[in-house]
Amino acid sequence: MGYFSWSQIEVSGIVYNEKGRPKERVEIHIQSTGVNQMTDGSGRYGLEVAEAGIYKLIAFTYGYQIFEKLIQISSDTLIDIALVKLSQDLSEVVILDQKQRVFNLGRLNTVEGTRIYAGKKNEVILVDQIVGNKASNNARQVYSQIVGLNIYESGDGGLQLSIGGRGLDPNRSANFNTRQNGYDISPDVLGYPESYYTPPAEALSQIQVVRGAAALQYGTQFGGLINFKMHQPAPGKKLELIARQSVGSFNFLSSFNSLSGTVGKLSYYTYFHHKQSDGFRPNSGYKSNNTFTYLNYQFNSETSLSFEYTYLNYLAQQSGGLTDTQFDLDPIYSNRTRNWFEIDWNLAALNFNHNFSSKTKLSAMIFGLVAERNSLGYRGNPINLNSSPVAEDDYKDQNGDFIYNRDLIAGVFRNYGTELRLLSRYKLKGTAGVFLLGTKFYKSRNTAKQGPGSIGIDANFNFNYERYPDYPNQSDFTFPNLNFSLFGENIFFINEKFAVTPGFRFEHIFTESEGVYSEVLFDIAQNPISNVEQIDDRSFNRSFMLFGLGLSHTIGPKAEGYANISQNYRSVTFSDIRTVSPTFIVDPDITDEQGYTVDLGIRSLTTKTLNFDVSIFGLLYDDRIGIILDDRANRVRKNIGEAFIYGMEIFGDLNLVSSLNKDWKEVKLNVFINTAFTESSYLASEENNVKGKKVEFIPMLNFKTGVNFGFRNLMGSLQWIYLSEQFTDVENSTIAVDGDNRNGLIGEIPSYHVMDLSFAYSFKNFKIESGINNLMNTFYFTRRATSYPGPGIIPSESRSFYTTLQVKF
C-alpha cells in the first residue's frame, strides 16, 4: 500500500519490445495494491489507483527482463516501458530469482482478479521453484513451507493428497475446500468433500492456501481453501513442448508431457501424465493416467472465455493396515493380497472474465463433475465382530482358495455448479474501497452402494448378490444435495496504512438421504437367521448466515500486521453415514459442526532478504465430530463436544547472500524455518473420559527446516521435518496390548523425523533432477486408518531414489 492522499489517478502508457515495437500480453502490476492488467494488441495499458503516493510499477513477460520502477504520482501519469530481452545463457539461479521477484514469493495480493485476500492468512507455493520429487507429488517437499500442515503419507505416489492442520483430520484433505483454477474438484462439496483427485505437481504453477477466513468466499470449511493453479499457456510461442520422464525405486515410472502456446487470440495448455509403480510394500502397486486441456480465447484486453477439461483414471492395490506389533516386527509387511481401489474422474469448467473498467471486474464460471470410485477388499470377517479387522488372516481352504468374499463399496458422483463474482473499486465520501459480491449455486446427486464383492484376487468391481444374499454389509443410498450461497466482502481503506474488511456469507443447504440397508442376524454358528431390509430416508434443510472481519495495518515499507475472525460451519457428510463397515459405526443423531477461527499476525511485504510470517491463532469447534471406540473395537463417529485449539505459527526464509550484502548473482543460499506450536483441549463433552483431553491429530510441535542452495545451473535442497506424538482418538487412548482386537486401531502416532535431499541441473533445453526421499531410511507412520486403505497402521515409504529428465522446446 502506498502513502497517499485521497484522489483518483490513472497510470497508463505503451510497452515496447527490444525493437521498439508495441508488445502485447505483458503483465503490468502496481505492487501491493492488487491492481494489474495485460497489455492489449497495441501494447497499451491503463491502471487506476485510488490514492496518490509512491508505488512500484512492474512489467513482466517471458523472455524479457523484469521492469521495475518506483513512481511518485499525484495526478494522471503517462509511463512508457521499454523491455530488455533476456540473454539465452542465463543460469538457473538467475532465472529463478527473476520469477521470485515477479510473483512476490509467498503471498497473495490484497486483491487478485475478483477475489479479496486482505487481512487473511494466506500462503502461496511457487511450484516451479521447488527442488524436489515433483514426479511423485511428494507432499513433504511440495508443502514444506506451508506452516503447521499435518500430512498423511501412504506411499501411493501422490495419487491422493491428505493434509490437515490445526487439529483437522488430514484424511483426503476433507477439511479444506479444494479447487482447481478456482472451481470445486471434490465429489460433493458438502456431502462428500474428500479429494480423490490431486493434480500432478508438474502441471502446477502455484498452490494457494488461505486459512479459515476463506469460509466467507469459498465455502464454510474450517481448514480454508486450497486452490491448485495450473500452468498457463506460453505467451509469444505457437508451440512449447515440455517432456519429463522419471524413474525411481520400486519400479516407479512417470511420463509427463505438455504442449502449450498462443496463436492469435487463442491460447492453449494440455498435458498427459502416466504414472505407475510396484509400491514399497507387497501388494501396493498402482497405475494412473491423467490428462488436462485448457483453451482460452481473448476477445480483447478486457474479455476472455476459457474452457478446461480434466480426466483421471487410476487403479491401486492396497496392502492393508498393520497392528502395532506387526509394524514393530516388519513395517513393510502386508497380509492383504486382494484389496483394490479405483477412481474414474471427469471434470469440466467454463470461465468468463470481463473488465468493465480498471475498477470493475466480472467473473462467471460453470463447472461439473462426473466420477466414480470403487473400493474392494477383505477387512476381516464381517460376521465375527470379536475378531481383529487388522490382524485376522485372509483364510484359504485346503485347495488354496479364499474362504470369504470381499467387501465392495461403489460411489457414483454427479454434480454441477455456477459461481458469479463482481468486484469494484470505488470512492465514497473521501474513502476508497473495494467491494466484492458473489453468488454460488451447487447441485449434486450421488449414489453409494455397499455389498458383497467377488471371492477372487483380481480387481473385479461387480457385486455378487446372488452368491451372497445374506452378506451383512449391504446398503444402497442416493444423496441429493442442493446448495445456494450469497457472499460479499468490502475493503475500507481507513487511511494510508489501515484497512478494514468485513464480510458475510448466506448459506442455504438442503440435503437428502434416500435408501435402504440390510439388517442381517446370525446364530452362534454364524448361520443367517434373519435378513430384513430397512428403509432409511432423511432430509435436512437449513439456512444460516456467517460473518467475518479482517484488519490489515502497514508497518513501514516492509511489514504488515493482520487480524481476522470468521465464523465456520461444516456440514455432516451424509454420503458416509449409512456405509456399513465391520469396524465403523455412525451415530444416527450426528449433526453439523460450527465454530470460529481467529488469526493475528505480522508478515513481510518484501522478500529480498527475509520472508516471514509469524502469527497466533485460535479455533473454537462446537459439536466437533470425532471417533470413540466401543468394547468391540468398533469406531463410532459422532458429535463429541466443544473443542478449543490454539497455537503459534512461525515461518521464516532468509536469503543469506542478500543478508551478507554479497553481489553473488550466480549463487543462491536460503535457509527456512517452519514451526507450529499447538495446544488443544475438549472444553465440554457428554461422553465419558473426553472433557479435558487433547484434540486428536495435533502434534504439539510441527517443525520443518531446510536449506535451498544453488550455483549457476546447479540447484539443491535439503530439508528435515519433525513432528511430536499425536493422538488419534478423542479419549487419547494408549496403544492396545498385543492380542487386543484394537491393536493397530487405537493409540498415539509416535513422534518421527524425516530428511529429504534433492538436486537439479539445467543445461540449455535440458534439466536433470535427482534425489533421495527419506534419506536416513526412517521407519515411521502418520496414520491409523479407520477403513480403507486399512484398517490399521499405514506405514510411510522407506528410503527411495528418483531421477527425472526434462526436455523443453
Where do the protein language model's features map onto the residues?
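Gram-negative outer-membrane beta-barrel transporters
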Residues: E496, T609-D622, R637-N732, M776, ...
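Face-selective signature of the C-terminal outer-membrane beta-barrel domain
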Residues: S301-T310, I343-V520, S552-T554, N564, ...
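Short acidic/polar hinge/loop motifs at secondary-structure boundaries
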Residues: Y183-R211, T583
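Extracytoplasmic beta-strand/coil segments of soluble accessory domains associated
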Residues: T114-R115, E123-P187
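N-terminal periplasmic accessory domains that precede
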Residues: L78-A82, N109-I116, A139-V142, L161-G167, ...
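Transmembrane beta-barrel wall of Gram-negative outer-membrane proteins
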Residues: V247-Q276, R281-Q317, W340-S358, F441, ...
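C-terminal beta-signal and adjacent terminal beta-strands/loops
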Residues: F617, V657, K668-L669, Y722-D738, ...
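Membrane-embedded beta-barrel scaffold of Gram-negative outer-membrane proteins
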Residues: N355, K361-R379, T554, E560-S566, ...
